[in-house]
Amino acid sequence: MGRLYGVVEGSELLGFCAITTDQDDDYRAVWDISEMAIVPHRLAVHPSAHGKGVAKLLLERAEGICKERGYKSIRVDTNAKNRATNILFPKLGYESLRPITLTGKPKNMLFNTYEKYVA
């Protein structure tokens, strides 16, 4: 499963996110990747839409898909230096786990991991 979801206002794309079930092997350090989960990737919001709840809308859509499919959690990672998402995820109820490195990225580049359980 992998689809790109967007938030559009008029003819302007305000933000988008790939909503997948893809869990890279690197995630084994944090999660049991044999468990199905929703995994949003590439969450991006146009600067003109910052602070307008666009990222929240996209993550709420991910939650809806998670519930529809009967999965128990949403798992995300973000660059440890991405201040906005490292504030956003806990604010939306995501539990902060531990930083990991990702294959193909510099070893000194850390990615924070988060998980949210849905009912």
Regions found by a protein language model. Name each.
Residues 59, 66-78:
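Conserved GNAT acetyl-CoA-binding A-motif
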Residues 77-78, 90-110:
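Conserved catalytic-core motifs of GNAT/GCN5-like acyltransferases
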Residues 1-48, 59-60, 117-119:
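Acetyl-CoA-dependent GNAT
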Residues 14, 83-84:
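Short alpha-helical
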Residues 45, 51-64, 87-91:
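Conserved acetyl-CoA-binding loop-helix of GNAT-fold acetyltransferases
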